Amino acid sequence: MNTQLDLPKALHDYIKKSNIALALSAIKDDAPLLVVNKSFCEMTGYSEDEVVGHNCRFLQGPDTTESARQPLHDFVHGDGKDSGRFPILNYRKDGTAFHNYVFMSRLKDTGGQPQFILASQFDMTTALQRSKISLNDEKLQDALSDVDQIGREFGLAMMGSAGLLADSIALMAKLTLEDSQR
């Protein structure tokens, strides 16, 4: 275990090495970010040092709607759903807006108690091409499979993620088709 972050070292290392934008937050307090990877930093323009310890609300801005914020808040601070997907308008460090599609899953211990929230982010502003969506889908499937395996080694579990992942992929494809028909 990485005692500084109180999370399995293998999970920490996997997130850092992943090619898709990943962030891991604590369940406790205000869900502070514990670790983010290079892809997350490239997408948002923030360094890891700037974001670790903070809730990801720093990505919200003047045009982020309450109707987009509330489902994220309910997921993070509620205990009903084990996973969810959330479209939200976020802002990079330089102030530019981007349409973020966030997939979140609770990582639970063997006793069923949530320990962490794993979030993957997709910039839908630039990912509205089929090839990019397909590539993101493949990377996300690989990432979820690897994280699930790593998590099991340390008594963590991702509950109900496969069905939600399939729904997310279908929705992303639908959004792409709708956008290309405009």
Predicted ranges, named:
Residues F40-V51:
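PAS/PAS-like sensory domain cap-loop motif
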Residues A31-L34:
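Conserved hydrophobic beta-strand signature of PAS-family and PAS-like sensory domains
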Residues S25, S105-L107, F122:
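Output-coupling edge of small sensory domains
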Residues E48, N55-R57, D63-T64:
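N-terminal sensory regulatory modules of PAS/LOV and PAS-like folds
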Residues G111-L165:
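Sensory coupling linkers of modular signal transduction proteins
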Residues A26-I27, F75-D79, I88-G95, K108-T110:
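PAS-family sensory domains
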Residues A21, G84-L89, D94-V102, L118:
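PAS/PAC sensory module
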Residues Q60-H77:
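PAS/Per-ARNT-Sim sensory domains
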